[in-house]
């Protein structure tokens, strides 16, 4: 059985909170050395390498103690000692015990790694696939060349489209191989199979024209080209010796400075308030500029734009464009990154691209079945689609994995209000406030609105005072104005109308419908309702479920 050897194998570092764990066996906290014995160090490295996934007790015992005669009690003592070294308390839990399963490191971790040395380069020519549709063939050829070009840092040099696009006959192929002498080439033929297609692929070593591999790949209708690229990339990895790509390698940040900026941005994103999201946007944009080849900042930026849209503090159309751009960039860096695939799944389903969205979610879940990120995105997707019971179940799974995720808690509160009613929503809101979201302004504004709807005006006014004025914008402002209407009836209408007049693109924001209904009446609200419905407004699907709009259904 292999034994864990804590001898340094690289210059990478693990960074979490104010700790830095080096591969030379040292642990620093706020730049001061913390003593960590070899066994505790080995367990910590394995948990950090697992990147939030569960590590079984048997795995830890096998890798750290090897063939030594030990039992689970030794591991339990080691975990206890490690928690003391990390100064764990009730508010700062680093290691989570999952009874019957193992342990998981449950805090954000960033791996800092200097750029890896360039491996030996292998040149690849991708020939245009034989297809009935010439235009489709050219488009697919371009997509595959572009996708596989992303693997250049790992030893794969792909000839450009301009050189290979006209290479279709045997004569053309032989001339290209003779003139440019690539190491390998890929050819393919697409054969219709009902509504789907079969792609027959050959990988050939040019020296001696030796056929290395043949494979038939079924392409389902509407399946994104990136999935075909990923399958081809995996085939190349199996067939070409010396290729060394690792999906985790290109997600690592390359300096302590960019890591610290990322962690600050991620922290602000997780706070999930209007002010914190604006701060996250600045920090994560800065991080992308510092580490343009790292995946994590692009994913966080995409989620940030989506969150700002949900909160009504960023133009919805522009935010969706930005979110998609950053999610696509992440998949260009790694076609198999589950978080990026989950984000694209959410974005596609918001835009009613249900088949593509479903495929992306399925792929993300296969790659990372126990991921709080994927559970959150999928639960959000189900909520938008009106599948409230399934959405609630999925969000609960997310919160089980990450109880401190503010955005998931807020989403659960909306779902509860829509699905089981205001009394359950008030109880859940109180529960969330007593746990991790006691000062969150969006939660407070929702509780103020719920209490006002129930006629508990004094308690609602008391809660309103706890909301910072700098946070009263977007959806928080809408919630508080609706609460003011519940408390003051007609006297609140001038303020609501003034707010609606100041809002830009009111005709593109279904989230304002509850205020429009009370301020301008049922006829105008119904006109807006029908407009959103006829236009298939992407956010209307979420707001049409609101119990306050039952008159318009």
UniProtKB/Swiss-Prot annotation:
The keyword Signal does not apply. The modification 4-aspartylphosphate is found at residue 62. PROSITE patterns: OMPR_PHOB, TPR, TPR_REGION. InterPro entries: OmpR/PhoB-type_DNA-bd (IPR001867), Sig_transdc_resp-reg_C-effctor (IPR016032), TPR-like_helical_dom_sf (IPR011990), TPR_rpt (IPR019734), WH-like_DNA-bd_sf (IPR036388). GO terms for molecular function: DNA binding. The keyword Oxidoreductase does not apply. Gene3D superfamilies: Tetratricopeptide repeat domain, Winged helix-like DNA-binding domain superfamily/Winged helix DNA-binding domain. GO terms for biological process: phosphorelay signal transduction system; regulation of DNA-templated transcription. Keywords: Activator, DNA-binding, Phosphoprotein, TPR repeat, Transcription, Transcription regulation, Two-component regulatory system, Virulence. TPR repeats lie at residues 372-405. Induction: Expressed in response to both environmental conditions and genetic regulatory factors. Transcription is subject to complex control and is stimulated by the SPI1-encoded HilC and HilD. This is Transcriptional regulator HilA. It comes from Salmonella paratyphi A (strain ATCC 9150 / SARB42).
């Amino acid at each position: 059985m292999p034994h864990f050897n804590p001898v340094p194998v690289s210059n990478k570092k693990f960074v979490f909170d104010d700790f830095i764990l080096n591969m030379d066996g040292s642990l620093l906290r706020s730049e001061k050395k913390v003593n960590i014995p070899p066994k505790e160090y080995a367990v910590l490295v394995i948990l950090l390498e697992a990147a939030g996934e569960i590590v079984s007790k048997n795995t830890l015992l096998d890798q750290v103690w090897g063939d030594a005669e030990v039992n689970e009690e030794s591991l339990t003592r080691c975990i206890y000692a490690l928690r003391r070294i990390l100064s764990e308390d009730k508010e700062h839990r680093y290691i989570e015990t999952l009874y019957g399963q193992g342990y998981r490191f449950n805090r954000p971790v960033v791996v800092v790694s200097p750029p890896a040395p360039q491996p030996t380069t292998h040149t690849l020519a991708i020939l245009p696939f034989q297809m009935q549709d010439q235009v489709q063939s050219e488009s697919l050829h371009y997509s595959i060349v572009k996708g596989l070009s992303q693997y250049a840092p790992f030893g794969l040099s792909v000839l450009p489209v301009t050189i290979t696009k006209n290479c279709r006959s045997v004569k053309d192929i032989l001339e290209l191989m003779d003139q440019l002498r690539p190491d390998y080439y890929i050819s393919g033929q697409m054969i219709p199979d009902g509504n789907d297609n079969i792609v027959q692929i050959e990988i050939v070593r040019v020296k001696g024209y030796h056929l290395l591999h043949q494979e038939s790949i079924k392409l389902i209708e509407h399946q994104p080209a990136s999935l075909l690229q990923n399958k081809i990339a995996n085939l190349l990895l199996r067939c070409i010796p010396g290729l060394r790509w690792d999906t985790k390698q290109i997600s690592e940040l390359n300096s302590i400075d960019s890591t610290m900026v990322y962690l600050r941005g991620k922290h602000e994103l997780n706070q999930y308030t209007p002010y914190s999201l604006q701060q996250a946007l600045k920090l994560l944009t800065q991080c992308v500029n510092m580490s343009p080849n790292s995946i994590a900042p692009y994913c966080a930026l995409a989620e940030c734009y989506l969150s700002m849209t949900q909160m009504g503090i960023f133009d919805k159309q522009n935010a969706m464009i930005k979110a998609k751009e950053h999610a696509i960039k992440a998949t260009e860096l790694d076609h198999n990154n589950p978080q990026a695939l989950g984000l694209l799944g959410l974005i596609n389903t918001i835009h009613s691209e249900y088949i593509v969205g479903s495929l992306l979610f399925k792929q993300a879940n296969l790659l990372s079945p126990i991921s709080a990120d994927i559970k959150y995105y999928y639960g959000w997707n189900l909520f938008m689609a009106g599948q409230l019971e399934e959405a609630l179940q999925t969000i609960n799974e997310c919160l089980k994995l990450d109880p401190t995720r503010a955005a998931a808690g807020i989403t659960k509160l909306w779902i509860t209000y829509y699905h089981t009613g205001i009394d359950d929503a008030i109880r859940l809101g109180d529960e969330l406030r007593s746990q991790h979201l006691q000062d969150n302004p969006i939660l407070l504004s929702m509780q103020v609105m719920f209490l006002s709807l129930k006629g508990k005006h004094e308690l609602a006014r008391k809660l309103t005072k706890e909301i910072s004025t700098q946070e009263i914008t977007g959806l928080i402002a809408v919630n508080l104005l609706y609460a003011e209407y519940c408390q003051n009836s007609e006297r609140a209408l001038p303020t609501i109308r003034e707010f609606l007049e100041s809002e830009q693109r009111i005709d593109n924001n279904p989230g304002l419908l509850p205020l429009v209904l009370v301020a301008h009446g049922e006829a105008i609200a119904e006109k807006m309702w029908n407009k959103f419905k006829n236009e298939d407004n992407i956010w209307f699907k979420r707001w049409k479920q609101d119990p306050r709009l039952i008159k318009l259904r």
